[in-house]
Amino acid sequence: PDLLNDPYYLGSQHARLEGQEYDDFIEEFIRGVRNRWPNALIQFEDFQTKHANTILERYRRDALCFNDDIQGTAAVVLAGVYGAMKCLGGHRKDITKQRFVVAGAGSAGCGIATFLHQAMVAQGLSPDEAYARFFIVDKDGLITNERALDGPGSEPLRGFVRNRTDLPDGSSLVDVIRAAKPT
């Protein structure tokens, strides 16, 4: 509320929309853009984690759309991983041998993990084999199945949450790196 009253605040002078009002606003915007510019690319930028994946999934089949946090960051990271493997004399298939620690479970972290996972599966690992090569750490530490993940935006994490016997839920990033030995 203080920000809304700040004379230097350039944003819209009303509280953030939530719930059905938010969903209706996004729907109206998408419909309006598609009616006016049917071939336009709609870029979703800096959406809250609790909305980002849901909105992308809702509209990706009906509109040309892209979420920079989920897809853009992930594409750059995947390209970097492929580039690093090439510099080390490897090939794309070598992604199946990698272990990843992802620091952050927001839109970007989930997108990165998802893209890397898809690349591993495309190179021959089963989905479960690929999931087992990931360690996801958020502000509360390592995420395992001991932690309830039922809030908005948690869907992309579900496959990565494993029954870990090597590290307990909430293990620090340093402890996870030491144990996981990411490549």
Name each model-derived stretch.
Residues 1-98:
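Glycine/serine-rich phosphate-binding loop and adjoining beta1-alpha1 elements at the start
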Residues 181-183:
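Short, intrinsically disordered, charge-balanced linker/junction segments flanking boundaries
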Residues 62, 67-177:
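Glycine-rich phosphate/diphosphate-binding loop of Rossmann-like nucleotide-binding domains
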